[in-house]
Amino acid sequence: MTRVGQEEENVSMVKRLYDAFKRREVHSIMDMFEDNAVMHGPAPLGVLPWGGTYNGRSGVAQFFKALGESLEPQQFDLNDFITQDNKVVVLGYQKGRAKPTGRPYETEFVNVWTIRNGKFIEFRVYNDTAALVESLRP
């Protein structure tokens, strides 16, 4: 496959993951990650429930569980995809409600996905951490 073809496939894979997340298809999501995948939340653990670094498929499951228990997205826009080699950067916007408090939140985000052999090996989240912390504050 050409470099451009591989980059297009990587973007398609990222879009499939977001679709599976919207449908809460945990098994589909888990199948897309390598066994030794690493996920980096937007803040240290303790600052946000899904903060910190998560290792392996069990860590991936913990990350998505904490995220799903904390936030109820009402709008989730994927605005742009930037790709080079095995990385896909997603620029987006999200707003919704913090489940524990019922407070609204909104944030722009940047997600960086690294792919190897058709599987995600690394995921990094960047967003407005202060806005999310405020929405979760009791």
Predicted features and spans:
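Short, low-complexity N-terminal intrinsically disordered segments enriched in polar/charged residues
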Residues: 1-35, 137-138
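Hydrophobic pocket/interface hotspot
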Residues: 14-17, 29-30, 37, 56, ...
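A solvent-exposed, acidic/Ser-Thr-rich amphipathic alpha-helical stretch
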Residues: 34-85
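Short loop/turn motifs at secondary-structure junctions and domain boundaries
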Residues: 72, 103-105
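Hydrophobic/aromatic beta-strand elements that line small-molecule binding cavities or substrate pockets
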Residues: 76-81, 95-96, 108-114
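A short hydrophobic beta-strand element
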Residues: 85-94
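Low-complexity, intrinsically disordered terminal/linker segments enriched in charged
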Residues: 122-138
